[in-house]
Amino acid sequence: MSPIIAPPAELVDPKDRVQLRRVFGDFPTGVTVVTVGGSEPRGMTANSFTSVSLSPPLVLICVGKDAVMHQRLTALPTFAVSVLEAGQEKAARHFADHSRPPGVDQFDTVDWVLGEESGAPLIAGAVAHLECAIHRLYEGGDHTIFLGEVITATRWPAREGMLFSGGRFRRFAPDADEGRAA
């Protein structure tokens, strides 16, 4: 074996929030918009979404304790997740913008439908929708981990999901075999 020549590494202090956030951002994720309904609907862009279990069907989302969405999630029994399609960067940026209007007005810039089970807005054109009942909450430092039991799930398999990595929205690269004759 020969020695590996690698670019210089950057040692990161895990107590430095800015540096640690960059390390976390090196992990590519999908992009979702988490929503709640009720008298004051709310949406929030989130990449901290994970499938947990098939039986029972569970997912988790992590929300900062200082976020308005945190207050809404702790007050309601249900939430929804829209897994964004690769072309929905505008929606992702909108629901990450802290200066967007409150309540239902924040949904004026996107097409959406009302979730029948959760009463939460579902972003039209998404790759998938999941409506969830809050199953359990866990402390996670400056975040709360919301475990949701999936009530309904809908997917559009012809759509391609959006990626987020290195602080940027990205798309999947075409498959190397795509377009080749069999």
From Swiss-Prot:
<dbReference type="InterPro" id="IPR012349">
    <property type="entry name" value="Split_barrel_FMN-bd"/>
</dbReference>
<comment type="similarity">
    <text>Belongs to the non-flavoprotein flavin reductase family.</text>
</comment>
<dbReference type="InterPro" id="IPR002563">
    <property type="entry name" value="Flavin_Rdtase-like_dom"/>
</dbReference>
<comment type="function">
    <text>SgcE6 provides the FADH(2) required by both the halogenase SgcC3 and the monooxygenase SgcC through free diffusion. Accepts only NADH and FAD as substrates.</text>
</comment>
<dbReference type="GO" id="GO:0017000">
    <property type="term" value="P:antibiotic biosynthetic process"/>
</dbReference>
<comment type="pathway">
    <text>Antibiotic biosynthesis.</text>
</comment>
<keyword id="KW-0274">FAD</keyword>
<dbReference type="GO" id="GO:0042602">
    <property type="term" value="F:riboflavin reductase (NADPH) activity"/>
</dbReference>
<protein>
    <recommendedName>
        <fullName>NADH-dependent FAD reductase</fullName>
        <ecNumber>1.5.1.37</ecNumber>
    </recommendedName>
</protein>
<keyword id="KW-0560">Oxidoreductase</keyword>
<feature type="binding site">
    <location>
        <position position="143"/>
    </location>
    <ligand>
        <name>NAD(+)</name>
    </ligand>
</feature>
<keyword id="KW-0520">NAD</keyword>
<dbReference type="Pfam" id="PF01613">
    <property type="entry name" value="Flavin_Reduct"/>
</dbReference>
<keyword id="KW-0285">Flavoprotein</keyword>
<keyword id="KW-0045">Antibiotic biosynthesis</keyword>
<dbReference type="InterPro" id="IPR050268">
    <property type="entry name" value="NADH-dep_flavin_reductase"/>
</dbReference>
<feature type="binding site">
    <location>
        <position position="98"/>
    </location>
    <ligand>
        <name>FAD</name>
    </ligand>
</feature>
<dbReference type="GO" id="GO:0010181">
    <property type="term" value="F:FMN binding"/>
</dbReference>
<feature type="binding site">
    <location>
        <begin position="47"/>
        <end position="48"/>
    </location>
    <ligand>
        <name>FAD</name>
    </ligand>
</feature>
<comment type="subunit">
    <text>Homodimer.</text>
</comment>
<keyword id="KW-0547">Nucleotide-binding</keyword>
<feature type="binding site">
    <location>
        <position position="16"/>
    </location>
    <ligand>
        <name>NAD(+)</name>
    </ligand>
</feature>
<feature type="binding site">
    <location>
        <begin position="62"/>
        <end position="64"/>
    </location>
    <ligand>
        <name>FAD</name>
    </ligand>
</feature>
